[in-house]
Amino acid sequence: MSFIDEAKVYLKAGKGGDGCSSFRREKFIEFGGPDGGNGGNGGSIIFIASHHVNTLIYFKYKQHIKAENGHPGLSKNKFGLSGRDITIEVPIGTQIYDEEGTLITDLNSENQKFIAAQGGKGGIGNSRYKTSTNRAPRYFTLGEQGEEKWIILKLKIISDVGIIGLPNAGKSSFLASCTNSKTKIANYPFTTLEPELGVAFINNTELVLADIPGLISGAHLGYGIGDKFLKHIERCSILLHIIDCTLEDIIDSYKCIRKELSLYSKALTEKTEFILLNKCDLLDKEEIAIKKRLLAEHTKKEIFTSSIKKSKQHILSILIKHINKDCSINKPFIYDPFNT
């Protein structure tokens, strides 16, 4: 399935049904009076946040959405049927903007609903205009037009941990080894072309991790593929920065990613960050110790290590402990995108 995280959609809600102008016509009743019913309301277009969908791919094939019109009122004071609403599931984390780019709403919780286009109200039948001074009104009102607009949908993935790093740092391998993610893995840059989600289970606690495609220098300007996905990091509670320990200059690798985060948004650099030296099975213990010390001196942070053989439970437990401890982090809705 393609990963679509932006879409421009035309919405047209249903028109309200017209009111009816009619009079009661029955045998032996000379002046039956007005009996025109109201028109039905037009159908609305509603978005609902759901864990059953992970991308906006629906809108790739459905860029124009039109709801049903309301039915006109009938004689004998019968109301017209209302048009059926259209309810569309979108991923949790979907933001809705107007055509000018102003944020309208942010669907960031399960089953959160938003009426994106309101259906028109049904017209009023002539029976409703009957008064003591006007016993036989002939006028009625037409149904109102439904809302009609262009909107822009943008998806920002919600996860506990955002995995960042240069291309080929081993982010996908790490995600696959500790979660049920089926991400593609290969020994060349930009293997991951779209964000991948995985769920790890530690001591009956769920941890959602997002593998953000590799960033390179200039990503915030559009170089590589990272600029498209930097926005997804904004929704991650904490960051796990994975660095390939076989690189000659690991400090430069670290600084490169931090610079791109800073140039995109200062808020990203203020997120809690954990650093993981990866592929440690490719170096001897002395080399690893030297690189850990250099990185720790530069970042003033504890450096964790990982390899193919080493269990990931330790670092995952630390991540969960931090999320549970820090009350300032709002833990997002947890779901398993591979078990729906």
UniProtKB/Swiss-Prot annotation:
Which PROSITE patterns does the record cross-reference, listed alphabetically?
Answer: G_OBG, OBG
Cite the record's note on assembly.
Answer: Monomer.
Its family remark reads: Belongs to the TRAFAC class OBG-HflX-like GTPase superfamily. OBG GTPase family.
- Write out the entry's keywords from A to Z: Cytoplasm, GTP-binding, Hydrolase, Magnesium, Metal-binding, Nucleotide-binding
Question: Which sites bind Mg(2+)?
Answer: S172, T192
Question: Taking every annotated instance into account, which residue ranges of this chain make up the domain Obg?
Answer: 1-158
**Entry protein name:** GTPase Obg
Q: Name one GO cellular component term.
A: cytoplasm
Q: Which organism is it from?
A: Ehrlichia ruminantium (strain Welgevonden)
The protein's matches in SUPFAM superfamilies, at most eight in alphabetical order, are given as: Obg GTP-binding protein N-terminal domain, P-loop containing nucleoside triphosphate hydrolases
Q: Where along this sequence does the record place binding of GTP?
A: 165-172, 190-194, 211-214, 278-281, 306-308
